[in-house]
């Protein structure tokens, strides 16, 4: 499983890279089916304390689906944490949906 962190119109510092990698590992622990995780960090040129100045986009490759999650925050570290939480919720929801479908198929077959 590979994790890629890229900056759009910004330089990704080693501290930011380490934080993003650590957060992405939380996603990979959630599901064994995650093939790849791409993190795009972007700073939007606006006012200094704009709550949407920093955007983080997760692209998560899983069999059958690609999950895309975005989050905004005034601080890049906070945006990474928000995006990670949103991605974890979305993956849990997909896993639960798949379990329900498998359960229904098992009941219908018997």
Model region roles, listed by residue range:
Residues 1-110:
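N-terminal, polar/charged subdomain of small-to-medium soluble alpha/beta proteins
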